Design a protein with these regions (language model features):
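Bacterial N-terminal signal peptides
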Residues: 12-22, 125
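N-terminal carbohydrate-binding/catalytic regions of secreted carbohydrate-active enzymes
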Residues: 61, 65-116
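Short, acidic/polar
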Residues: 75-86, 156-164, 250-256, 326-332
């Protein structure tokens, strides 16, 4: 697992510990099986103690707490993150530009992990170019398009590895990158220079290198935006968008997803595109059972089955969703459709979303077994052991203010100049920034959309 690599724990120790507690496979939370201890071997010999049961780490949680373990929510501060964990037992957080400085300065993620009942998923979207949350501290990183035009795949892998090491030092575990979108849009379009190339083969080559670099650093990459956003009719931050029909996507936009679907220790993010021939006109891919089946099975576009966790794009701040669905309904519909982790950019609405999902389970619309499978997938990338009494490998036990030393660069401005870019990663001109360093969208933002935290 990538989380084991991230924490540099000895595999032998983990395997031995699991063997000692008799854990051979994960049991669903509601179906954990007990194992009987052996009897005495003869007169005067004490009976062997019972072997500890292999209970899921989620077995002692209420249904509501287990549902909350699937949510990934954006936080506005470390205090906001602590409230989400303490009040709702949230399993994942997303940190945007406004929180990165606090994390770097105060080491808040190690403290946050210490209060969580299980290792948290800590995510960010660090693509490079105009989608870079850590640039003021780690220096600039080129956009995907610039990297593909100026660097070899080996150089891109090394650049991503260095970026991943900085993220790991902060305590980040998941990066919503790279983009697998195939696009020839102008640089500042919604995808634009976030795409490596208009050539699917080149996108595959460079996205493979970028994701390998993140994995080298112990960061879980999440490919996006399935089934392809590169030829969309607009920006899903501001309106419903469509892409070409499925038969056209299969031969072009879906090729990188097909080539990389079998990459171990990775996730996928579904976008909010409407796809003729797949999703219909009434809902985006992120809430379409057909879109999740396409990704999971792989048969419909010539890919292997995808076994990793599936995230949604932001469900609260993007109007392709929020204009038609309330947050509680969007979260519930996404889980019913097949998402493992609904993602949204604020801690608002957690309670209402939990109420809605609980109601769906109570009404038989959402099966508990379906949630158990999602919990198992999310536990895998969070480093949660299969057995409740196994070693909790994901928690940063004994960490200082940060999980690992950070090669900090001073932020630009009065505090000092920004660190120069690595020679292997030539910098590009910085895009104009909105409030809190938000990357600039392709059209003026609506006032209700809090762009600084958006997972792009």
């Amino acid at each position: 697992m990538s989380f084991y690599r991230r924490l540099r724990l000895t595999t032998v120790v983990a395997i031995t510990a699991l063997a000692l507690v008799g854990c051979s496979s994960a049991a669903p939370a509601d179906q954990a099986e007990s194992q009987e201890g052996g009897e005495g071997t003869g007169e005067g010999v004490a009976a062997s103690p019972p072997i500890s049961p292999c209970d899921s780490p989620f077995a002692q949680m209420s249904q509501r707490e287990r549902i909350a373990q699937l949510f990934t929510v954006g936080v506005s501060s470390m205090a906001d993150a602590r409230r989400a964990v303490e009040q709702h037992n949230i399993g994942g957080v997303f940190i945007g530009s406004s929180v990165v400085g606090e994390v770097v300065a105060g080491g808040g993620l190690a403290q946050l992990q210490s209060i969580a009942p299980l290792p948290l998923l800590v995510s960010i979207d660090e693509e490079g170019g105009r989608v870079s949350r850590i640039a003021p501290y780690a220096g600039p990183m080129p956009s995907a398009r610039v990297m593909a035009n100026t660097m070899s795949p080996a150089e891109v892998r090394e650049t991503a590895r260095k970026r991943g090491e900085f993220l790991a030092g902060m305590g980040v575990t998941v990066d919503f990158a790279p983009s697998l979108d195939v696009s020839d849009q102008p640089d500042r379009a919604v995808i634009g220079d976030r795409s490596f190339s208009p050539d699917p083969a080149r996108v595959t080559e460079y996205a493979r290198a970028f994701s390998a670099g993140l994995l080298d650093a112990g960061i879980t990459p999440v490919f996006k935006h399935f089934p392809g956003h590169g030829r969309s009719s607009g920006d899903s931050h501001f309106d419903a968008v469509t892409v070409p029909p499925l038969d056209q996507l299969t031969a072009h936009d879906l090729r990188p997803f097909a080539e990389l679907a079998a990459t171990p220790d990775t996730g996928m993010m579904l976008g909010h595109q409407q796809v003729p021939g797949l999703t219909g006109a009434d809902r985006p891919a992120s809430m379409s059972p057909a879109a999740y089946r396409l990704l999971r099975d792989g048969h419909g576009y010539g890919a292997p089955a995808f076994e990793g966790p599936i995230f949604t794009d932001d469900l609260s701040g993007m109007r392709a969703v929020s204009d038609e669905f309330s947050l509680p309904r969007a979260v519930t519909e996404a889980l019913i459709a097949g998402a493992d982790s609904p993602l949204w950019i604020t801690t608002d609405g957690i309670g209402e979303a939990l109420d809605s999902v609980e109601a769906a389970v109570a009404n038989g619309v959402l099966q508990p077994e379906r949630l158990d499978r999602s919990l198992q997938r999310m536990a895998e990338i969070r480093g949660i052991p299969e057995c409740a009494n196994g070693p909790v490998t994901g928690r940063m036990v004994g960490a200082g203010s940060l999980g690992a030393p950070l090669p900090l660069a001073a932020p630009a401005g009065p505090a000092g100049p920004a660190a120069p870019a690595s020679p292997a990663a030539p910098a590009e001109p910085a895009a104009p920034a909105g409030p809190a360093g938000a990357d600039v969208p392709s059209q003026p933002p609506a006032p209700a959309v809090p762009l600084p935290l958006l997972p792009r």
